[in-house]
C-alpha cells in the first residue's frame, strides 16, 4: 500500500479513507516544509504554512484535477501560502532563519555559511514570484516543465522569469558587496 502512486491515494482519500490522506501527508510533509522554509527562512513559519497547506489539500481535494501531477498542485498551494505568509511577516523576521552547512573543513564551512546567509538575505529582498522560481529550480531542483505546472505558466515564461530572478539576485548580491 505504501508504494501506491499519488493518483491512487487521492482516489482513496476522495472515497473517505483517512489512512490514504495520512500517506500523502507522510510523503509530502518534508518537501512541503522545505519549500516553505526556502521561501520564509523561518522554521516556525514554515511549519505553520505546511499545516495550512495540508488543511487546504484536505478541504479542496475534490478540486484536484487527476490529469495533473499531484506534486505540482501541492507545491502551488505551498508557494501561495508561503507568499501569503511573507505578506504577514516583517522583513527582519523573514531572514532570521539559520541553516548549517555540512562542509568538510571548518574554514570552508564558515565561508559557505556566510555565502548561504548572504544569498538568503538577498533572496528575501527580491519579489516573491522571482524568489519562487529560484527556490523551485535551485533548491528543489525541479525542471522547467514542472515549474510551469506549479506556477501555471508556459515553460518559456518560466525560463524568462528565472533569468530575470537570477539577474535581480545578482544585482542585490553586487549591491551588498558579496559578488
Q: Can you say where each PLM-predicted feature lies in the sequence?
A:
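Internal acidic/polar
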Residues: 2-3, 84, 91-116, 143
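Short, charged helix-capping/linker segments at alpha-helix termini
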Residues: 2, 14-23, 33-52, 155, ...
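Arg/Lys-rich amphipathic alpha helix in sigma70-family domain 2
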Residues: 62-66, 76-96, 112, 164
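Amphipathic, Lys/Arg- and hydrophobic-enriched alpha-helical face
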Residues: 25-43, 60, 123, 168, ...
Amino acid at each position: 500500500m505504501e508504494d501506491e502512486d499519488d493518483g491512487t491515494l487521492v482516489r482513496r482519500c476522495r472515497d473517505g479513507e483517512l489512512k490514504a490522506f495520512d500517506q500523502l501527508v507522510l510523503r509530502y510533509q518534508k518537501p512541503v516544509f522545505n519549500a516553505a522554509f526556502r521561501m520564509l527562512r523561518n522554521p516556525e513559519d514554515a511549519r505553520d504554512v505546511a499545516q495550512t497547506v495540508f488543511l487546504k489539500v484536505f478541504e479542496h481535494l475534490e478540486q484536484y484535477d487527476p490529469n495533473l501531477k499531484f506534486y505540482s498542485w501541492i507545491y502551488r498551494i505551498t508557494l501561495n501560502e508561503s507568499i501569503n505568509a511573507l505578506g504577514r511577516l516583517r522583513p527582519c523576521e523573514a531572514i532570521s532563519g539559520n541553516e548549517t552547512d555540512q562542509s568538510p573543513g571548518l574554514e570552508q564551512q564558515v565561508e559557505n555559511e556566510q555565502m548561504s546567509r548572504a544569498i538568503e538575505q538577498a533572496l528575501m529582498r527580491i519579489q516573491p514570484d522571482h524568489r519562487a522560481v529560484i527556490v523551485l529550480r535551485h533548491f528543489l531542483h525541479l525542471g522547467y516543465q514542472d515549474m510551469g505546472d506549479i506556477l501555471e505558466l508556459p515553460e518559456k515564461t518560466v525560463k524568462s522569469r528565472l533569468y530575470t530572478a537570477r539577474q535581480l539576485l545578482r544585482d542585490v548580491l553586487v549591491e551588498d558587496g558579496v559578488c
